């Protein structure tokens, strides 16, 4: 599949504005803000909706899933206190945006997605963008035990309770 992404002054300016909004909302981790300012969020949207990419809102990405609100991504990432080389398990790859933020911070990312269509798109788009987490298709409630232990675990998927396997 061929991708043709554009990232010009308009998108870069929109990312800068988004970073300013996140600062005003209390995000202080400079590494997180720098990562948000670098990762082109519009690449995770259908081109028709690129004008929505830098609003601080969640947005549908198909399969009944959404790309998380940028504030949520920044807040959760800030709470993780990522250090270069941290081994991070992400439950719920979704669009792949959160994985890219973690990779920008120097984490080794292991990400699992249960929706096959999202997984198939993400395993193509992220490497095209230069991001190479370890991808898995499956039930994230069980984690990815063959690569455990992890330094950090982030759950970006909804669940009625925290699975015992992740504790």
Predicted regions and their residues:
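Class I SAM-dependent transferase core
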Residues: 1-89, 97-101, 105, 118-121, ...
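Conserved nucleotide-cofactor-binding alpha/beta core module
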Residues: 81-167
């Amino acid at each position: 599949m061929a991708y043709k992404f554009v990232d010009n002054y308009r998108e870069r300016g929109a990312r800068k504005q988004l970073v300013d909004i996140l600062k005003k909302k209390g995000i202080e981790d400079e590494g997180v803000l720098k990562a948000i300012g670098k990762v082109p969020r519009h690449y995770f949207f259908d081109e028709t909706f690129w004008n929505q990419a830098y609003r601080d809102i969640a947005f549908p990405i198909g399969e009944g899933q959404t790309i998380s609100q940028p504030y949520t991504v920044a807040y959760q990432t800030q709470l993780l206190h990522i250090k270069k080389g941290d081994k991070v398990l992400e439950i719920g790859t979704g669009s792949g945006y959160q994985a890219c933020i973690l990779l920008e911070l120097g984490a080794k990312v292991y990400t699992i997605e249960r929706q096959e269509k999202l997984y198939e798109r993400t395993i193509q788009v992220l490497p095209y963008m230069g991001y190479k987490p370890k991808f898995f298709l499956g039930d994230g409630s069980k984690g990815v035990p063959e690569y455990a232990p992890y330094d950090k675990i982030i759950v970006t998927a909804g669940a009625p309770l925290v699975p015992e396997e992740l504790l």
